[in-house]
Amino acid sequence: MLSRPSSRFLSTKRGPGPAVKKLIAIGEKWKQKTTRGLPKQDTLNSGSKYILCQFPYPSGALHIGHLRVYVISDSLNRFYKQKGYNVIHPMGWDAFGLPAENAAIERSINPAIWTRDNIAKMKQQMQSMLANFDWDREITTCDPEYYKFTQWIFLKLFENGLAYRKEAEINWDPVDMTVLANEQVDAQGRSWRSGAIVEKKQLKQWFLGITKFAPKLKKHLNQLKDWPSNVKQMQKNWIGESVGAELVFKVADPKFENLIVFTTRPETLFAVQYVALALDHPIVQKYCEEMPDLKEFIQKSDQLPNDTKEGFQLPNIKAVNPLTKEEVPIFAAPYVVSSYGSAPSAVMGCPGHDNRDFEFWQTNCPGEHIKTCIAPFFDDASKVTEQERQRIIDTVPFTSTDGVLTKECGEHSGVLTVVARKSIMGMLNSEGLSKSVVRYKIRDWLISRQRYWGTPIPIIHCDNCGPVPVPESDLPVKLPELEGLDTKGNPLSTIDEFVNVACPSCGSPAKRETDTMDTFIDSSWYYFRFLDPKNTSKPFDREIASKNMPVDIYIGGVEHAILHLLYSRFIAKFLGSINAWSDPAGIFEPFKKLVTQGMVQGKTYVDPDSGKFLKPDELTFVNDSPDGNTVIIKSNGKVPVVSYEKMSKSKYNGADPNECILRHGPDATRAHILFQSPIADALNWDESKIVGIERWLQKVLHLTKNILSLEKDLAISKDYKTPTDLNDAEVKFHNDFQRFLKSITESFEVNLSLNTVISDYMKLTNILESALKKGEVRNEMIVQNLQKLVTVIYPAVPSISEEAAEMINSQMEWNQYRWPEVERTTESKFKKFQIVVNGRVKFMYTADKNFLKLGRDAVIETLMNLPEGRMYLMNKKIKKFVMKFNVISFLFHK
């Protein structure tokens, strides 16, 4: 057994060989030029392209997932620049947030210092991978020059009634001591950031009225033709449109207001047996003041599972069914969602026709009778036995929306549910007890965070005036500089000089808002700021934004389908509604085409006995295995279980992109990332396979050198056109080259199949190499197509392209950046004809494709004069002669 080198086992990795060292050196040689981009190309495409990848949080280190996104966006950026477009390809930093604050606490420094240091490191890493970003457009969300306008947007939302403060039940992260939006709590009830079990608290919070835009957010998804269907479906599900009715349940106690209950099935009113209220409902809160048992129930409710069926019946209070006038009990129930936004805070319970209500009733009222009001409908055509019919009728709950109302439903008895639904609504509408509405599951966006490192909310609280917006002339409300953070929670509330201010309205002593904004607000509008980053008077110029929006291609992870993408759509639509930008389509969508790249997964090794994840130094190779590549566990000689999983420190399967670039060079790393997987699919990272890419890059350089050595004085005019007098080999060479050139162009422009781009590059290289070896294609054509190859590889492997172009430029002048036009395929002027004698092919003859038009006698005479013709055709009497397509047939007398 012998340890052998592998990228997975860095401790045993040998250094690169001479050929790979050359690739690394070429990357370093051209780094400055390639990261600056390329000259503007003058072509027919004078329009613009806005290509944007989701900007990163400045953690200080890029991971392979980052690298994948940036290689995709940079390749598209370079391609469209070569096509002559004015490409906007900016980069910035999503710099506020908990990680920086927590890091600052650990180091006792200001988070701004930690953030700036990390940005400098990550910019250097981006340059190492040859990324060409518009650094003159760079933005950082923690800069006052940026968050000044985040605050401006908040004030506009406040001005339009879309930013408001109210007490609500919130998700509290006990580790980070801050509030989380619903989207930041996972299915297990844990914080997306700290992993802590989230608690429920009542707290005054700031919300943004995203629910007001819910109809447009849902409707306009249908017009996003270039978005992945799974992302659109996730947003539709999150928005959650329901068409139904708001019903008025009067409360049998005059000191309480009526209950507004939303339902999609008013026909089940005949079977309502209770009403359930959210824990923050005013009635529940009123009872809570007088009932310690209820208060304890609410306090413990955050420990219950999300689908809990526990409830607390409120004493001495009933709700009146608007249809039957029957009084039913009222429960406080954790399963009922809170009241902010468009979500209901009161629901009616029908145990006989809803599974959840059935379980709730059995939990809280065990053994009590269950009402039903809908029975299955069997028409004459129903092929159901009487026994089966009875079984269906006796099943409780009966949850089908199709059926007939039972005899207990008075004048509605025997009526189909769909008919009864309309008639019941008509009756209740006439009494003012119902109205048809569309409700949405989405709730208003909770943006308050009780932390320091975020955008301050520009509101001042005055005892006389209430919440007062900070005047625009006083923006930005700057974060006070702190040398070190030594506590969790909200340090802003402890800084008197920040908190204590005069009211802008009346001048009285007042208090500044100490909550900061959710960082998703910072990233909800950054794509606008990139277009006009130096503007000091407004977030962006209306004309500039209207000209360049929406973003043409937006690249990022599917994990942001609900959070960032939904919030960005909301803010873009809001800014459109206040005329901050115009959209000819009238839908104000920020991203035209969305590209969601798959996750990069690392090779993971697990001990088959213990299930323990194995570190690289716990593994070795077997050199006498059939493939010479079998990994075993050093301690016991067993073969580990191998799989590809999400990269993480705990699984020891991470990969450092900077190390990969140092070992293989930037071009090989870039091409390897593109080649390994289609963009939307997961990428199983295996650095050992990069050797194929390295060989191809070396072949490109060797091929360039060999082709240019054909004739030292060979020069190709800039206006060189493919000749028309091509031989068969040249026709095939030309057609094959154009076929792959077309495929590459379409892969960039149409289907973003960048993995096939790399394979097509390799095929073009092989076509040139084959033509050079065979010597059947004239040198000028080979050189011309070498130039095209060097040009089209530039988006993916820019420094190798530059190196090859430098060799070519030493002998001739040409535009190495302009993307070549795909030429039409051509046909040979010659054709191969089969010469058939008495039913058997005797020989082939290549002639002008119009050879048969010479006529019978001329064709026969020509063939007779050939050596093969004299052998097979001379001195024989023709019985039948046929010329058709590429066949010339002789039938001779015996």
From Swiss-Prot:
Catalysed reactions, semicolon-separated: tRNA(Leu) + L-leucine + ATP = L-leucyl-tRNA(Leu) + AMP + diphosphate
First-level EC class: ligase
CDD domains named in the record: LeuRS_core (cd00812)
Pfam family, one: tRNA-synt_1
Motif 'HIGH' region: positions: 56-66
Thermal characteristics: Optimum temperature is 37 degrees Celsius.
Keyword Transmembrane helix: no
Compartment(s) where it occurs, according to its Swiss-Prot or TrEMBL record: Mitochondrion matrix
Motif ('KMSKS' region): 646-650
Keyword flag Iron-sulfur: no
Targeting presequence: 1-9
Disulfide bonds listed in the record: none
GO BP terms in the entry: Group I intron splicing; leucyl-tRNA aminoacylation; mitochondrial translation; mRNA processing
A cellular component annotation (GO) from this entry: mitochondrial matrix
Enzyme Commission no: 6.1.1.4
Cross-referenced SUPFAM superfamilies: Anticodon-binding domain of a subclass of class I aminoacyl-tRNA synthetases, Nucleotidylyl transferase, ValRS/IleRS/LeuRS editing domain
One annotated GO molecular function: aminoacyl-tRNA deacylase activity
Alphabetic keyword roster: Aminoacyl-tRNA synthetase, ATP-binding, Ligase, Mitochondrion, Nucleotide-binding, Protein biosynthesis, Transit peptide
Recorded effect of pH on activity: Optimum pH is 8.0-9.5.
Function, as annotated: Catalyzes the attachment of leucine to tRNA(Leu) in the mitochondrion.
NCBIfam families given in the database record: leuS_bact
Protein name: Leucine--tRNA ligase, mitochondrial
Source species taxonomy: Eukaryota, Fungi, Dikarya, Ascomycota, Saccharomycotina
